[in-house]
């Protein structure tokens, strides 16, 4: 799909991307898929993008970007929201799946940071997908050799729709946006996703919006708002 778009928009433009982008994309998609087997839509999104935020803020700090007390307070508040969500208890999500989702968030944070230097979002996204293909084929071969999952027609159609629209086109758009904002802005922008995912889970999947998830979401988004309201120093 991306190759077709690339040929239509820029017939003479070659593919971009890198093996680093392909690796980050593969790890994100694989870990994300494994983790969501046992996590609800809202919980998974909150853990995922909380990890994304921490990854990108840490990168910005290592690169020499200094933050005000308000930004640091917002980061700590958002992190506290994630801790609140994962505290042991009857309403706590599975810890192993949550940790896998956090690793997926680190991979997506790395993928987003790699996109900050992208001047050709569509070409780079298409190239990154191609670079991830060998790893995907190895994973598919492993599933075939082992006791692979049963694949139905509806599952294939959902996967195609997700890959073409949400992943292919969506990632290209994100690469076009992320290069125009700072690392901390990119990180905080993405934390609106858990709220959307939670509402979608309740509306489309019949999931229950627990009090713990609701409170954790408010704390995380409050931290994001606090961080965004501060000026960089």
Please place each PLM-identified region on the residue numbering.
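Hydrophobic transmembrane alpha-helices of multi-pass small-molecule transport proteins
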Residues: 1-5, 25, 67-87, 104, ...
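Transmembrane alpha-helical segments that form core, pore/gating elements
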Residues: 1-5, 55-57, 90-146, 173
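Hydrophobic transmembrane alpha-helices of multi-pass small-molecule transporters
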Residues: 1-6, 29, 53-60, 82, ...
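Specific transmembrane alpha-helical segments of multi-pass solute transporters/efflux pumps
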Residues: 9-49, 55-57, 77-80, 84, ...
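Juxtamembrane helix-entry segments on the extracytoplasmic side of multipass membrane proteins
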Residues: 14-15, 87-107, 142-161, 208-218
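Cytoplasmic-side transmembrane-helix entry/capping segments in multi-pass membrane proteins
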Residues: 14-23, 64-79, 98, 120-131, ...
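Hydrophobic/aromatic residues within transmembrane alpha-helices
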Residues: 35, 61-67, 118, 124, ...
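Helix-helix packing/entry segments at the starts of transmembrane helices
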Residues: 44-51, 114-134, 167-203
């Amino acid at each position: 799909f991306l190759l077709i778009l690339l040929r239509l928009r820029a017939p003479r433009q070659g593919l971009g991307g890198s093996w680093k982008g392909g690796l980050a994309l593969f790890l994100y998609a694989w870990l994300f898929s494994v983790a969501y087997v046992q996590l609800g839509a809202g919980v998974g999104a909150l853990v995922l993008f909380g990890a994304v935020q921490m990854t990108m803020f840490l990168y910005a700090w290592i690169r020499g970007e200094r933050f005000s007390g308000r930004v640091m307070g917002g980061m700590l508040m958002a992190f506290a929201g994630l801790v609140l969500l994962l505290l042991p208890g009857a309403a706590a999500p599975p810890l192993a799946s949550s940790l896998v989702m956090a690793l997926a968030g680190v991979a997506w944070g790395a993928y987003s940071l790699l996109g900050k230097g992208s001047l050709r979002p569509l070409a780079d996204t298409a190239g990154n997908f191609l670079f991830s293909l060998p790893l995907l084929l190895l994973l598919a071969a492993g599933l075939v050799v082992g006791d692979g999952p049963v694949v139905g027609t509806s599952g294939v159609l959902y996967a195609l729709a997700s890959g073409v629209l949400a992943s292919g086109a969506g990632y290209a758009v994100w690469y076009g946006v992320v290069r125009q904002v700072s690392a901390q802005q990119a990180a905080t922008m993405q934390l609106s996703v858990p709220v959307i995912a939670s509402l979608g889970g309740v509306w489309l999947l019949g999931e229950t919006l627990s009090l713990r998830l609701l409170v954790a979401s408010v704390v995380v988004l409050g931290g994001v708002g606090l961080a965004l309201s501060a000026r960089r120093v």
